[in-house]
Structures are given as structure tokens and as C-alpha cells.
Amino acid sequence: MNIQTQAFIAVTAQPIPYYADTTAIFNTLCQSNSNSLLLDSAEIGSKNSLQSLILVNAAVKITCLGHNVTFKALNNNGKQVLKEIHPKLTALGKVSAVNFEDEFSVQFLPLDNQLDEDSKLQSATIFDGLRVISSLYQHSQTPIFLGGLFAYDLVANFIPMDGITLKNDGINCPDYSFYLAEHLITIDHQNQQATLKSFCFAQEEQVNIAKTSLSIAQKLKNIDHVLSIKAASDEVKTNFDDPEFTGIVKALKHHINIGDVFQIVPSRRFSLACPNTLASYAQLKQNNPSPYMFYMNDEDFILFGASPESALKYAPENRQLEIYPIAGSRPRGFDAHGNIDPELDARLELELRLDHKEQAEHLMLVDLARNDIARVCQSGTRKVAELMQVDRYSHIMHLVSRVVGKLRPELDALHAYQACMNMGTLTGAPKIKAMQLIYQFEQQKRHSYGGAVGYLTSDGHFDTCIVIRSAFVQNGMAHVQAGCGEVLDSDPQMEADETRHKAAAVLKAIRQVNTQAK
């Protein structure tokens, strides 16, 4: 689908004072606002901060659940956007509303699983909920910004789920939730520069938008660095204890033996009280700086994390699509005092590099990434740009690779995400069968875990990370999920231990904060 219609937009950009502490900025501007988002990034080697994006407030919230996409205007600015997109969406699905000016929903038809891959990509789908808005403002010299979450379970709308029933675990997460930015702060930490951008979609709202920009600039003169902390229990519970989880690993090994899959990623969930979400994110960020760090303040949940792994990245200037598979891990080499022992750390890296099981698992997933890239990229452009490097984080080290290709001209980044979700490092291979088996054995939704957080702009840029090393917080409880890459010769207890190692950094950060106030 190609939507060329233009709509009014006025964008202003003004320099603002640089502050390194983005958590304090978010606390000052957004802590009382739902529908706000903080994206931070750090360099893998040096751990130095690179860039940050703060979606201070939004004009429209776009939420998907099943085959229904809901568009909610959050103010008068957003109402104009709904007015613009409504007629375009009526051509794509069944539209319903009590008051079309404030909120409406679009029901898309389920895709026929008998269609070939290209026909599925060219059909109207729930991704058009985002595509319509992005396309409407593609003429804007300063691109609009859509930031948010694709849940893991979004994929259930696109794969056969016959005979699969999932238990209600009491957690509610939309299939996707995105915000159309009204005010966006961009921070370049390397050059110590910051800019406040405002996006006005309704001509009559320009004065109000300017007033809000002035108010934001004034608040930045008195940044609140103090995060309120409440005492809470540091007790951690899990949905599968070690015997239960190793039992799942053993049962899945049967499916590897009979050839259903040759690699799969079972997971389990660790839960604990988390009344101090922003402070926990700040602690995690301090303990474990990562390429992708995020704090999403939704009306219905809070999601924060420090992910090492890109989900899908797209640059329109050269049409390069990129997947960054991470598979194979070892704990960091700590001494008896909890400090990194360089010699032990180096030995563990060598052990990781020489482990045949880890090599096999990693190469399977590199091959799966190559297949995903090939599905949507031009023939002959796919290549493995980096192979089996080692990235280090606070508690764990990983084998990583980078696979790239040139996206076909008739497709965009949302088509690519539809074709590639969910990332193979969180599912296994063959991917569809692995995802079906995961649902059968875990028997519940994964919610945010294994999905993607990031952003889409109207000029086509798309940058997302896999939601791992993260906490989904709802009703005061944080849910931290972690998986393991299982192959034929996997040791069940080692796989259970791997999930604990992967969850450790987030659990530690939350527990540190919970006990600070005691």
C-alpha cells in the first residue's frame, strides 16, 4: 500500500541545554505523564553514552490487540491526525467508534495462511495502522517520530495457531503500542548537544504547542535529580522452578530428535515487587550500560530494560536492512569479591569461542537471519558483515554477528518486520514450528519479552531492539523473562542456569533499589 496524501504539519526545533542524566530529565518532564518514552544508547566497548531520545508527550496513541487497531487522540493536536487518517483507514478495514473525533478502532481481516509470502506482505494488515500515519507525513522535512513496543505475541496474528490454547497469566500487554510524538528531545552525548522538537498537526494548535515547548524548556532549568524510593521485598518467584524448566528442556529435546526443530528457545519468568521503576532503570543503566536501553511509561504498564541485541534496523538512505543475532553466552569472570578477574574473564571467553555447542547454535541463528534478510532483500545483496565477535556486559558475555541486505524497493521497514518477526534468537528454527512449540510448552503469552522496542520515522528510518534483559511492570510487580538456546546436545541444568544468568542484571538492579529504602 502506498499513501501519498499530504497533511498539514509544522515542526520547530530549538537547542536546549545539554544534560547527561537522561533519567533525571525524564523524571522532571515525564514521570507523571503516561504515553512517554525514553531511549538511551551506549557504546558496547567503552560503555560511554551515545544518543538519547525522549518522547516527552504524544498527540496520538496507537494500540493493537488481535486484529483490532485503536487510534486515540490525546489532545486537540491528535484529533486533527485522527481526522486525516480516518478516511484512509476505512478503505483497509471495518472502522467503529463512539466518537470518531477522539478515538476509533479498525478491524483488519486475518491473513489467509495459504497466501504466498509476497501476497501476505502486500495485503492490508495491522501494520497499516502505523504505515498510514507515517505515510501521511512523509513529505515533512523533519520526519515525525513513532515510538513504542511490538509485543512477541503480535506474531500470533500471522502464524497458524490451530490447537494451541494459552492460560491467562493475569498480565495484560497489547500486541503493539506506539505513540506519535508531539514533543521530542534528541540528545547527542558525544557532542554534548540537545534539541527540543515540536510537531504540530493542527494549524489552530500552533500557539498551544509553542507554549508547551516553552514550559518544557523552563522545567529543564530545575531538573529533579531525586528519585523517590519505597522499600519493597526482594523475594523473587518464578513460573517454572528448575525441575519444571529442565523438564521442558528435556521434552523439547524429543522434538529436536524427531526433526520438528533443530534449535529452540524456551524461557521462564522471574517476578518480584517493583514500586520504583524509574530508579530501577537508572540502577540497571548504571550497572549494565547497553546499546539499547529503554523506559516506556504506558497507561497500562511500564517497560524498562538494557538490551544488547538489535531486532531490526533499517536505513532508507542506502536501503540497508540489518539483523544482529546474539547466541552463545558465558557468565563474566568474577573473583571472590565480586570484581572482574581479567584472566578468568579471558578464559571464559576462550571457552565460549571453542564450545562446539555454542558455535553450532550461533551459526544456526546466523543462517536463520540470512534467510530472514533474503525474504525481503534484493538478490545478491545479503551478506554476513561480522561473524562471531564477543560483546561483554555486566554479568554475561555473548557471541554476536551482523547480517545485512538491501531492502527491495516495493517494501518498507514495517514489511520487513512483518516478514522477520520474531527474531530467531528468541524463537529457534525452523521459526514457525519453534514458535508453535514454545506456546505449547510455556502455555502462556510472552507479552513484551522477545518482542521489540524502538521507533519508526516518516522518512523511513526504523530502529528496534529485542526486548530482553528487561522488566515488564504491571500492578507493582516486575516480570523478568529469560530464555536459553537449546540444541540436540544441550544439558538441561546448564540451560536453566543460563536463564538465571540472563535475568541476573535486571533482578539485581530492582533488588538493589528495593532494599535502599530499608
Swiss-Prot record:
It catalyses: chorismate + L-glutamine = anthranilate + pyruvate + L-glutamate + H(+). Coiled coil: none annotated. Mg(2+) binds at residues 361, 498. InterPro entries: ADC_synthase, Anth_synth_I-like, Anth_synth_I_N, Anth_synth_I_TrpE, Chorismate_C. Keywords: Amino-acid biosynthesis, Aromatic amino acid biosynthesis, Lyase, Magnesium, Metal-binding, Tryptophan biosynthesis. Chorismate binds at residues 328-329, 449, 469, 483-485. Its cofactor is Mg(2+). GO terms for biological process: L-tryptophan biosynthetic process. GO terms for molecular function: anthranilate synthase activity; metal ion binding. Pathway: Amino-acid biosynthesis; L-tryptophan biosynthesis; L-tryptophan from chorismate: step 1/5. Binds 1 Mg(2+) ion per subunit. Gene3D superfamilies: Anthranilate synthase (3.60.120.10). Feedback inhibited by tryptophan. SUPFAM superfamilies: ADC synthase. Its EC number is 4.1.3.27. L-tryptophan binds at residues 41, 291-293. Pfam families: Anth_synt_I_N, Chorismate_bind. It comes from the Bacteria. Belongs to the anthranilate synthase component I family. PANTHER family: AMINOBENZOATE/ANTHRANILATE SYNTHASE (PTHR11236), ANTHRANILATE SYNTHASE COMPONENT 1 (PTHR11236:SF49). Heterotetramer consisting of two non-identical subunits: a beta subunit (TrpG) and a large alpha subunit (TrpE). Part of a heterotetrameric complex that catalyzes the two-step biosynthesis of anthranilate, an intermediate in the biosynthesis of L-tryptophan. In the first step, the glutamine-binding beta subunit (TrpG) of anthranilate synthase (AS) provides the glutamine amidotransferase activity which generates ammonia as a substrate that, along with chorismate, is used in the second step, catalyzed by the large alpha subunit of AS (TrpE) to produce anthranilate. In the absence of TrpG, TrpE can synthesize anthranilate directly from chorismate and high concentrations of ammonia. This is Anthranilate synthase component 1.
